[in-house]
Amino acid sequence: VGSVYIVGASTVLGLCISIPIVFFVNIYLKKDSKLANLTRLSFDVLYGIPSIVYGAFAFTIMIFFGLRTSLLGGIIVITLLIIPIFVRSMDEVARQLPKELLDATYSLGATRLEAIKVAIRQIAPGIATATLLSVGRAIGDAAGVMFTAGFTDSIPTSLNQPAATLPLSIFFQLSSPTPEVRERAYAAALLLTIIVLILSIIGRMITYRFSKNKIK
């Protein structure tokens, strides 16, 4: 349940932050302008930072403000972790948008907001792929949430309570001397594999559906 809460909330937040950044870089700015290239470089650097660094940094901030490990801390760290994945994946697709498509849209008197709607229809497969990659990275991450979300056997009922994720459950239960506990770890590992497989299938279906509307 903790994985569902953290991954679901961080994915929504990541999309809400990443999509405006991608459209700002590719529509409001020139694609190859200095500011656009600097923005891409910044997210490339963030993409290469290990998740444990995000977790350690967030943990330091939490200690400074006297905060405890919680569901909210896990959501924030995973959101920061997947935003570079969202931006890089969607930016690669957005840069391939035909310039003639946007020119034709503006020539018909469309506003930038209407041009963005047209662009969204074209890069929808990229958004689906970015979401798939981000969810896969988020649901399998253990290092970041180990510092921030904590671990508990109970279901969190508020953002201030600790939350257990599947990877952390597998990690702690595999080290148990009790066979029954280790069996639960194997079951959790199987469940995690099935979830990733289902997400992969859904992502491919969404990509195929929206690719029919893409202008080549």
Name every feature range the model reports, one short phrase each.
Residues 112-148:
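Transmembrane alpha-helices
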